Design a protein with these regions (language model features):
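Short secondary-structure boundary micro-motifs
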Residues: 8, 41-43, 125, 135-136
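Short linear motifs at secondary-structure transitions and domain/linker junctions
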Residues: 25-32, 114-118, 125-129, 137-142, ...
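Compositionally biased non-globular segments, especially hydrophobic aliphatic-rich helices
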Residues: 11-15, 171-173
Length: 179
């Protein structure tokens, strides 16, 4: 039985993620490896604001806004951490309010939030300022970089998903899906 425990521990150690792994992945831009449950568990276990922040930034790069909740709660010890937590919670708020407006027709035009360099934030700002053209159930925006974005709801398996389709010229360059 002891051999089984030792073997299980050895195998788990082989696949364990370390803080150094996360830093290396961050430096080389492997955000998909950072925005994973194993890294989330690591920063919770170590109570590391630096790892929590790297995780949150990686999840933003991967457009996994829902993953910002846990690091937002953990970032409170330093001024920089609190500022980052405020930005992450603002993005979560913007996503939720846009979703509410699109799915349930709630007027959010009176809302103003801090300007954040993130596509969902730019769409939120333009939506609340009514800086769009509405075509059927699609909202069309001209982004600050000159690209065009379309915002709409798509239902899959009885789940309404908010979609942002980004176009460079007439060519679809990116699709972001939130719910």
């Amino acid at each position: 039985m002891k051999i089984l425990y030792i073997l299980a521990f050895a195998i788990a150690s082989l696949f364990a993620v370390s803080a150094d792994d996360v830093r290396n992945w961050d430096q080389i831009g492997q955000y998909n490896r950072i925005c994973q449950e194993s890294v989330r568990n690591l920063f919770i276990e170590e109570q590391s604001e630096a790892l929590a922040n790297m995780y949150a930034k990686a999840c933003l790069k991967m457009d996994k806004v829902n993953e910002l909740v846990v690091p937002t709660v953990m970032l409170y010890k330093t001024k920089e951490a609190r500022e980052n937590a405020s930005l992450y919670s603002t993005i979560i708020f913007q996503k939720k309010m846009l979703y509410l407006a699109l799915c349930d027709g709630v007027d959010i035009s009176y809302l103003r939030t801090p300007k954040i360099n993130y596509i969902l934030s730019e769409i939120f700002d333009k939506f609340t300022e009514r800086a769009y053209v509405k075509k059927s159930d699609t909202y069309v925006f001209t982004l600050e970089n000159g690209e065009r974005a379309e915002l709409f709801i798509k239902e899959e398996e009885e789940v309404k998903k908010m979609v942002i389709a980004i176009y460079a010229g007439d060519k679809l360059s990116s699709i972001k899906i939130y719910w």
